[in-house]
């Protein structure tokens, strides 16, 4: 029996492993040598066929796709730029419009800081509040003029109700130690004096103020395209009016000049000022109904825009539009109440 030394086995094993590795290398080399020509041939065929990822055709296609994407991006960016410019212009335009209208409404000669301090807002935004409405005989540029018509309005936006109380312009009041007609208070102390005088007379706290002169009333009426009212009786006055001297009874649309005649004429009636005050309330009621019947906040905004130069008030543009919008749907036949302060005429000092 013979034996093989251990180191001989290791050598044999190493020899065997070495042989296997050599064989594997030879096989791999042979395979590589055998496939190299095929790979080269295939690559050559692809290039010649124009399908290589680096071919001119594909490069041109890629370039065209990039140009299309770039053009789309440029179009989108251009549109966004246009929209942004339009938006900015619109915002600026609205801002200028708002400031212009606001400046016309809040005439600083009338709406003074003293007046704003006298006006008193309601305790809660939902509470009813009082507005003093004046029709004046003032002319553009004048600062001293009288109140020709005086109406205290109670506005209840939540319940969509308005109450208008006419105060006779000849009502006697004690003002700063002297007795005078209430309409003369405006001549001496302007809007602020009138608000204080009416507060004391009626025991209220007025929240807002608005006035319009004769020309303004006619202008507002024309801006609305006329106002439809029911003229209850024939009226004629040729001594105090020239443009319009008479109106016949019946439902009719009054233009500016006719509206001025309807709301100012008094010598044609036996009770003089009382009928005139009733006509004034009737006209304002009809005007409110006509404005609210549009049912459109945009239309209300347009009306504010077209009449701002004819009205003076402490209210802002947004306040007026908001109030008008709140009152849309109001039943103007039932929910606008009108009355006048009971009084009797007395001749004083001759």
Predicted feature descriptions by range:
Residues 2-14, 36, 40-42, 46-350:
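Non-catalytic, solvent-exposed segments at the cell envelope interface
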């Amino acid at each position: 029996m013979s034996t093989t030394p251990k180191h001989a086995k290791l050598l044999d094993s190493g020899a065997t492993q070495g042989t296997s590795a050599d064989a594997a290398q030879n096989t791999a080399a042979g395979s590589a040598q055998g496939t190299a020509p095929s790979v080269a041939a295939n690559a050559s065929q692809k290039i010649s066929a124009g399908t290589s990822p680096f071919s001119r055709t594909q490069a041109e296609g890629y370039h065209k796709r990039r140009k299309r994407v770039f053009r789309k991006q440029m179009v989108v960016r251009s549109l966004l730029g246009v929209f942004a410019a339009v938006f900015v212009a619109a915002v600026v335009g609205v801002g200028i419009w708002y400031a212009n209208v606001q400046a016309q409404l809040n005439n600083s000669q009338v709406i003074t800081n003293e007046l704003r301090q006298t006006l008193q807002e309601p305790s809660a935004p939902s509470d009813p509040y009082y507005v003093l409405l004046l029709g004046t005989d003032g002319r553009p540029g004048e600062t001293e003029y009288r109140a020709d018509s005086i109406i205290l309005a109670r506005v209840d936006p939540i319940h969509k109700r308005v109450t208008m109380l006419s105060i006779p312009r000849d009502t006697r009041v004690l003002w700063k130690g002297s007795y005078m007609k209430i309409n003369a208070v405006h001549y001496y102390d302007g809007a602020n004096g009138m608000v204080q005088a009416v507060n004391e007379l009626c025991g209220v706290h007025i929240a807002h103020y608005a006035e319009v002169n004769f020309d303004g009333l006619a202008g507002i009426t024309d801006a609305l395209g006329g106002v439809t009212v029911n003229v209850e009786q024939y009226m004629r006055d040729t001594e105090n009016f020239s443009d319009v001297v008479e109106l016949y009874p019946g439902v009719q649309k009054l233009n500016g000049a006719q509206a001025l005649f309807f709301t100012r004429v008094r010598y044609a009636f036996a009770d003089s000022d009382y009928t005139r005050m009733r006509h004034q309330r009737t006209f304002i009621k009809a005007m409110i109904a006509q404005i609210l019947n549009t049912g459109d906040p945009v239309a209300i905004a347009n009306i504010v825009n077209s009449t701002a130069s004819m009205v003076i008030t402490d209210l802002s543009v947004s306040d007026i539009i908001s109030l008008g919008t709140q009152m849309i749907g109001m039943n103007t036949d039932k929910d606008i109440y009108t009355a006048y302060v009971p009084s009797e005429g007395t001749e004083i000092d001759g």
